[in-house]
Amino acid sequence: LSGRIFCPRPVLSCSKSRPSSLIKIKETQAYKLHAEIGLEKSIGNSDKQGEVLNPMNMKMNIRFPYSMQTGDKSTSLISAMTFVKKNVGWGYGSQIRHKQAINKKEWNFGNSLTVNIWVSKDISDQLSWSLRGTFIDQAPIEGRDIIIMAPVQTSNPANYGGQTYEIALGMNRLISFGNGNRIGLELVIPVKQNLNGPQMERSHSINLAYQKSF
């Protein structure tokens, strides 16, 4: 059983809670195959408001567009299948993950499908590098908040989601204290984006992660 809570910045509140379970399907000395099933509950705000300056140079209080909300109050089913293989210092893997909203309010971010494939190579007993490719297909926002009426493209639910292809180069290092402690650093670069409507494209990003294995 695992659980995750996401806290985006600079918002000082957590946006999601995701308890999930891993189910071992098959495991040999050469490879592992397991499934994941879980629920993701959006616990962030979906009605954040603030003061803006309109085109008439007047201040007004509005409800922020969807992209500036930290949650949509929905509950989603998370399902995934992961395959991992080891061979003489090399590692290979693939994962397919699906997110489907099953309990919705007046609007929710679109369902998504994510596919990952990766290869890794041990440099030493403690250090390894990895190369990963990712495909993300996300549907537009479902529903609408009739109070979100700002004259910007992000107020249109159709201008969300789309398809994104990314590559990522990472380094992983075991840390000396305890057992199964690992730190990972990864550079993610979008290589192709087919987005719905006018949107700001994703830029490159850096991920820093800590992993504890039992």
Across the structure, where does each feature detected by a protein language model lie?
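Outer-membrane pore/translocation modules
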Residues: 2-97, 101, 154-156
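Outer membrane beta-barrel transmembrane domains
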Residues: 104, 109-214
